[in-house]
């Protein structure tokens, strides 16, 4: 019997907004909580454990929130940490540095990928009695992804994702030139729609 109340920390990150797998992951989240989280919480409640749930899905899912949640987590020696990710993932071409994937966390920029190994090492260092880290994602080789053992973005970066090259082009356009620009997407008597785009009349 534990001498004081202990905590089971749940950190769940689920991509429920993805165009291809979002609906499946919505169901996955329901199953995760219905058959896994709630079951474990009930079984451990009689042993003095209370659950603390950090549930990131929909618009709350982001690499920044994942990194912050991992780094800010505090626990006691008899606590339990459960990390669960459902979403897209991958690995760099010919990457032999780890067998574990990098997690997309609802976006697709390489600079924002979160290595599952980093999550494991960070949580292991917290000193809890048990750490469980599960990544329900692909681990296939992905062009454009680079090998990394830790997140490569800074702590103050926001949720607007762009590669360094994209940022440099925008900076060049806005800071290296002066003048005025007037643009239209159609000539007189023409519509703006084309190519059966789903973007709408003003974006095609």
Ranges and model annotations:
Residues 2-98:
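Boundary/activation segment at the start of structured domains
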Residues 3, 7, 123-127, 174-176:
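Short, conserved loop/helix-junction motifs that constitute active-site signature segments
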Residues 10, 14, 40, 83, ...:
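Residue-level detector of buried hydrophobic side-chain packing
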Residues 13-16, 56, 106, 138, ...:
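Short strand-loop junctions, especially beta-strand C-caps/beta-turns
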Residues 29-38, 110-120, 156-167, 203:
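Well-ordered, non-membrane alpha-helical segments in soluble/globular domains
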Residues 48-50, 128, 179-180:
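A generic structural signal for alpha->beta connector loops
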Residues 67-86, 90-148:
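Caspase-like (clan CD) cysteine peptidase catalytic core
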Residues 131-204:
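Active-site-proximal C-terminal subdomain of hydrolase catalytic domains
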